[in-house]
Design a protein with these regions (language model features):
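Compact beta-sheet-dominated domain cores in extracellular/mature segments
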Residues: 2-106
Length: 106
């Protein structure tokens, strides 16, 4: 009985170690449909894609998505917004073609 309890505890500890941590969300925005043109990789909230570090406001036409992201047509996550949780070769299909000004993981 005691041996079974020790084995069970060891198995539980191993399962905790072997479980991968949740992957960090990221999104890659592309300036052309079907993942073409210039691209930027983002792994944190960006309130203003026009900011000098990004200079990508109103340019995105497609996106590769890992995790869940909110994409909004105005700065500071305002205006029309869409939820993205999969690769999107044509943001036009979501009404966001060349409109994204802010993005954040959810």
């Amino acid at each position: 009985m005691k041996k079974s309890a020790c084995l069970l505890a060891a198995a539980a500890a191993l399962a905790l170690v072997a479980t991968p941590a949740a992957a960090k969300p990221w999104i890659t925005l592309y300036s052309a449909p079907n993942y073409g043109g210039h691209s930027i990789d983002i792994d944190h909230p960006v309130r203003d894609l026009d900011h000098h570090d990004w200079d990508f406001g109103d340019r995105a036409q497609s996106a590769r998505v890992h995790g869940h992201w909110l994409m909004c047509a105005a700065k500071n996550f305002e205006g029309d917004c869409v939820h993205l949780n999969h690769d999107t070769p044509r943001l036009k299909d979501y009404g966001m073609n060349r409109r994204a000004d802010s993005v954040r993981p959810e």
